[in-house]
Amino acid sequence: TPVAGLTGNRMRAVADPVRANVFYAYDDKALVASSDSGATFTARASLPSGGSRLIRAAPEREGDLWAPLKQGGLARSIDGGASFKPVFDIDYCGAVGFGKAAPGKTYPTVFIWGSVKGLRGIYRSLDTGATWQRINDDAHQYGGPGDGHFIVGDMNRFGVVYMSTAGRGIVHGKPVTQ
């Protein structure tokens, strides 16, 4: 059954973690939202075309969305997709995900596969995207997230991250102290 308001294919809807029956999707140039359990979607905000089809909703936060826009960088909405602001210093973002918050922090760790100031890699932010720390090295690039389009942190263990790859399965990383 076709879904009203969705024009693309291979889109992946994500649920709002707080509001029941609310879903979001990236429809190549727009963030679309549904408030009727995905029966219909309407455009909320314009976004650059060519981004990853897998947006993320921040855990336990209403309307807090992150959109990896590939060459368009990374954008964040805190109003359910009505508007987006760019996350600074991100030149490219192929995937975004969340993990357990750092000790003493309340916002989940944000992980990306992308480029920060021109340097490609796996990054994490402990401060809602204000600063980024590269957590891989040049010898461990894995071809990026490949067709899986995902990077996700462990919500139970701080610092642990998993990423799909381009032909190498799923890789996982953890802090050297674990």
Question: Where are each of the predicted segments found?
Answer:
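Conserved Ser/Thr-centered positions that define the repeating blades of beta-propeller domains
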Residues: 1, 34-35, 41, 77-78, ...
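A short beta-strand motif characteristic of beta-propeller blades
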Residues: 1-4, 41-45, 84-88, 135-140
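Structural signature of eukaryotic scaffold interfaces centered on beta-propeller domains
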Residues: 12-18, 54-61, 95-105, 150-157
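Residue-level marker for isolated small/hydroxyl-bearing positions within beta-strands
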Residues: 25-26, 68, 111-115, 163-164, ...
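Residue-level signature of beta-propeller blades and closely related beta-rich strand-turn architectures
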Residues: 29, 71, 116-117, 167, ...
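Conserved blade-ending motifs and adjacent loop-strand segments that build the rim/top face
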Residues: 48-50, 88-97, 131-156
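Loop/turn-rich, solvent-exposed surfaces of beta-rich toroidal or solenoidal domains
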Residues: 57-64, 68-75, 85-128
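Blade-level signature of beta-propeller repeat domains, shared across WD40, Kelch, NHL, RCC1
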Residues: 143-178
